[in-house]
Amino acid sequence: MPMPKERKFEWALKPTSSVSWGQVKNKSGQICVVLEHSLLRGVTSDMIAWWFRNFANLKVTLEDVEGYEGEKVPAYWLWHPSDHINAQFVGKLGENGTARAGAKIRIKETMQYNKYGFQFPVNQELEIFYCEKDGWGMGKRIPFFGKMIFLRISYKDVYEDGKIIGVHYHYEVVAGTNKQNIMAKAINKKLVGGFTAEFWEAWITHNTIEVGVFENFLPVLYSQRNDLNSLSYSKNMNPITQGMALQEQKGYDQNLLEERLKGYELSTNAFEYQQGAMKSILG
């Protein structure tokens, strides 16, 4: 997977201290991860839902980004300045080739490329199980075992004095089968073996940056949604400034994080507890 050169957007990237997360193994040996991002400021859930439906199809002209001046590139490259390579919607798509439940997405990226290179690559085709205004869910099934991994994102607008001040963004991942035969246990053991401390450090860093930069580029692209063939981005469009105390931000709902981790730990089938193809747990 050739890696495109880094995009120097000059954004202040959120640190991992701005998220709260935890990991448990349930009674069936499934790995369950819950992650609470800090409040996404200047963003709405409508913007995020629009992005998930469209992002793999979008191209954007980078007007003044060093090394990319005037170049039209995948909008997927804005979603992370160094780790993203390519994304493509395939299968039974919605209107104008948009994502919907039942379609698939092909993803090529790598976790924390600047530190680990291609040590933690992603080159997968995943099924989209949920694509609605309140969230996104995708995963992988294998014959005889069913779901093997499921990533579920939930988001909800947060109001103050009747106005939206940001988005609560909640992420859950389940990996492994709940089945208990010899083959299933061997599969789970292999999966768990790949989830090293280095892997989690790379994934959490990648995900913190990926979600955090919604504040930097998403309002700009969403404002141009009526002309998707002429999307553009320049550095003076950044709505978030350097001085907004990134280091002081924390995961939005610690109680929800702990509640979900406990639920997963007590579960015998984490996919049933996750309810990844149902409405958002945020209500």
Indicate where each model-derived feature is located.
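Glycine-rich portal/gate segments that line the openings of hydrophobic small-molecule binding cavities
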Residues: 73-146
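Hydrophobic/aromatic beta-strand elements that line small-molecule binding cavities or substrate pockets
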Residues: 36-38, 124-127, 148-160, 172-173
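Short, surface-exposed loop and linker segments with low hydrophobicity and enrichment for Pro/Ser/Thr
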Residues: 99, 129-132, 153-168
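Terminal "cap-and-tail" regions of soluble proteins that handle hydrophobic small molecules
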Residues: 1-30, 158-283
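Generic structural hydrophobic/aromatic packing signal, biased to beta-strands
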Residues: 35, 79, 105, 126, ...
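Hydrophobic ligand-binding cavity/cleft-lining segments
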Residues: 2-93
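Residues at beta-strand starts and edge strands
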Residues: 29-34, 46, 99, 149, ...
